[in-house]
A protein has these predicted regions:
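Catalytic machinery of carbohydrate-active enzymes
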Residues: 1-340
Length: 340
């Protein structure tokens, strides 16, 4: 059945009338960091084709990350995957006469077959990461060991500045103090457990930074990380928790106010890079060459080698490899970033 469906969609790609012109659709339906990685490519595409139409197919989270981005003409939001939702989206998108589709990253397997119905002359994506559907691409790009930002720039075929963009809210999430007291942020969570530095290490680091710098400690986290954030705040006298319902633009404004953010490999790390806040990024099982801070002067990567071969990744329930990152090492690197 799978092979029959692939042949059907491949044939459909050739039978449908093809749209032409500079009418582009970006597909990015994964996480916060994945979405931010696409902003340099979107900006470069706009600079190369200033009069083009640029639409973005994304998730509600992705739309929030890209909110107020001046290079995007229109959003198409993928809220659910039932067939009627895709049919409604299909109707809207076909009316836009999309000529070229750039698939940055998608976790939803039906998206690529869906794209074949849009009448685009070109469907471009990196080969090997499309859940066995590479045959539906008109222009498969070779997979390389390169940063995700660079991969997206190559997909759109443009060159440009690699700095990410996000547009923080104008409201200040933290009250100003007089005299000003620096704010140091800790982000102890991550989508996957195997990327998390131990809570006890964050507590010890937060206390040392507070005592040494005389700073305020703010601990950030998503709605599912409230218990983790609360645990760390309780371990650091005077620390403040900042969790949901912060919007992405409010979180960006908060991180922009920080003198430093110490973070696991997760979305807020990329926000810090986008708003130019000094960031200490803690890495072990993931590869910073692919997904770490990229050409960001005010950032440092603190990395240790993996301890399991192969890495268990999402199956890991005790990320002891992350314990290799010592508190003293994190403290000294934090001071170096803070004093700049």
């Amino acid at each position: 059945v799978k092979n029959w469906l692939l042949k059907f969609f491949s044939l459909l790609r050739y039978l449908l009338p093809k749209n032409i012109g500079n009418r582009f659709l970006i597909v990015s339906t994964t996480g916060l960091g994945d979405t931010l990685w696409g902003t340099p490519a979107i900006r470069a595409l706009r600079k190369t084709y200033p009069g083009a139409y640029i639409g973005v197919l994304t998730t509600p989270l992705g739309k929030e990350v890209l909110k107020n981005n001046p290079h995007i003409d229109e959003f198409f939001v993928l809220r659910h995957l039932p067939i009627f939702s895709l049919l409604a989206l299909l109707s809207h998108l076909r009316r836009r006469r999309i000529a070229k589709i750039f698939i940055f990253h998608t976790s939803q397997r039906p998206i690529l077959p869906f794209c074949t119905w849009l009448g685009a002359s070109h469907i471009v994506a990196t080969a090997g990461i499309n859940k066995g559907l590479d045959s539906l691409l008109t222009q498969p790009m070779p997979a390389k060991r390169q940063h995700e930002i660079q991969r997206r720039l190559e997909i759109v075929g443009c060159f440009g500045d690699v700095s990410m963009e996000i547009f923080p809210s104008s409201a200040s999430p933290l009250q100003e103090t007089s005299p000003p007291i620096p704010v140091v942020g800790l982000h102890p969570g991550a989508k996957d457990l195997f990327k998390q530095w131990p809570p006890s290490h964050f507590i010890a680091l937060g206390n040392r930074l507070k005592d040494h710098l005389g700073c305020h400690i703010v601990v950030t986290g998503g709605p599912e990380e409230k218990e983790l954030v609360t645990k760390i705040v309780r371990g650091i006298e005077g620390a403040k928790a900042m969790t949901a319902p912060l919007s992405i633009s409010d979180l960006a404004a908060l991180i922009q106010q920080m003198a430093l953010l110490v973070t696991n490999d997760t979305g807020p790390m990329h926000i810090a890079c986008a708003v130019k806040t000094p960031a200490l990024a803690l890495f072990c099982p993931t590869d910073p060459i692919l997904c770490g801070p990229y050409h960001v002067p005010k950032s440092r990567i603190l990395q240790k080698p993996i301890t399991c071969t192969p890495c268990l990744k999402k199956k890991c329930r005790d990320p002891f490899c992350m314990r290799q990152i010592g508190i003293e090492d994190a403290f000294q690197n934090s001071l170096a970033l803070f004093y700049g």
